[in-house]
């Protein structure tokens, strides 16, 4: 025995006897597992004495070390750090250098192996490879801890030679699979895949019987299947299916085939805040928004509308699944160490390559500074090793925002179209495995992003220098479209690096057109001044946006069907004609006429290519947020106030009984409700509500009392729903769903941007509350949403007005030029805005007092 071994033996003995003390002094709660009779057998050192006396604090499980993991959602018992493992690790290197061959295994003869253990061990060996100097793993690690009283003479090194312990922490950090967890997963997968066809068919029928809003009830939904499998399922043009995005939790991917090429479109899930305590889910697809995925599919299949402008792909033939979702997940997304060829395997090892359906692992919760601390996956120390931290980070997917795609379109930063080649970078292991894993088309994908703990995304400058970067996946191979938002690969990689395409290549030519629209005007003007006309404009020169200085409303040259060339303000015959036209149709028809005129004025509809070139943007909703869109903002302010005044004149001009005025009030309330709910026109909804809330109308007590008596439902609708909703809109707390909006509520934003030109109409919502700064910030934040979804408003307006046959007379009544001529005459319509509004406020006050004179205090 060497001198070092003697010192180690003395330290070991001192720890055994001095650290634990006398066994008789132990409390009864720490009594030995065996009776005191077993202590008399100290001289017997047979290797098959498994029932040895062991201390409760260092006891390890009997069978293979099946430590529970938080990702498996099993019990967390037994995951505490073992103090004996640290000691065993220090002497393991010395033992391997001294001994050339392994000692006999200390396996108790009376404990049988659990079923399927050999198969699980074979899978583990295939995944990790054999170790040359380490003996085979024994299924009984409990022989490591031997009672210190029974073997005081045996050196520590000899005991550890006979039963080499496993360093649980090191092999978990290195990404090696555990035998126990593989055994559990193998059994679970085998149980699912070995189900009888009758059982699978019955389970599929139960899924298809669910509610139609439940995605599982539709056969074209295939769950978590790999990208390659989905491409093989769509065989003909028009075939399509919906699957889960394997990297963006909660998102979906529409896979279809068009022009003999498989295309993938990502469906983003966003949370829309509709109030302080109410939120709902929206699914954004291209420039459209839907309440649920089945509505998206019904819309595109029923209308045969192309899913994207770039590809022109049309879907009409669903590819139905023939197995339940549980079976598909077991086939492609559950097995870690399974020997089935379809089981996905991570390139960086089986550990951490799969994610449970409703949970995320600790890697997804890392912040950027934690991820960039280390270079390699196995040797990373940025992650805390105790499993308690993993338990705390295994949160529900519904409780955290998506880390891979923005949850709101407001936070999206558009990718530069000038970079069309996307290089996907995956973290690779620091050392190659002893046994090479077979390449599989499914092994590249997995249900969890392939960023192992501590892998660091390299910067653009050093990304290509590393020896372990994986092959690049260009965007052009995934789809022919240059649109990054529509054709980004939803299933591979954690981060991407944009590489500029080579000038003259096909990718460069395809992206030049879209890049001109995305770049700022300053960059394009600078390029024009330095290099002349850009080559990517296909022979066209850059057109500077036109800064409009004159209003689009010109009452003097307005050609009318109802108004003569020269008219006076508030002509009685003209007012009677307008009242008759408004009474002939119902509130919904009026709302459609109003919405059509609004969308034409705001340039949501009827925008030609020439108009887009002159504006510099595609839609008016984006123009009104820009500096050169000032005239559009002023025109919308003019239209808002003119519309409110005309409706107020229509009510106050009713000189009949209070019942007639109450009926007219009721129809006006119905018009506001139709504009809000059916048409999604928040602009005219606010204008109609502004007319009802005018002081000259709200003071008509007899009219409102009659309304509550004769039209109770209208009065309740106005007081309980419409007024609170408008208040929430003005305070920036609530808004309609994007899928139902044709004209957003932009009046507060316009008032903020044009505060010097906006006519005073009472206190602003941000000036009469203590939360004024929050209200202003909410409206400025909403401006980003308005500018971003201009195409969505255009699509919604087209859908709601599809097949609508408008009457020219009603369209003229709701046009701004007609209203200006009606209210101020042919000459007064050209006067200044402030003067017109000031005079007409006095006219409305006079009409109101004529209907219901003010009660004098002496008459009370």
Curated annotation (Swiss-Prot):
Keywords: Cell membrane, Cell projection, Cytoplasm, Membrane, Phosphoprotein, SH2 domain. The modification Phosphoserine is found at residues 22, 359, 440. SMART domains: RasGEF, SH2. It is a peripheral membrane protein. One of its GO terms (molecular function) is guanyl-nucleotide exchange factor activity. Residues 405-420, 427-443, 479-490 have a biased composition (Low complexity). Residues 51-117, 130-180, 335-537 are annotated as: Disordered. This is SH2 domain-containing protein 3C. The gene is SH2D3C.
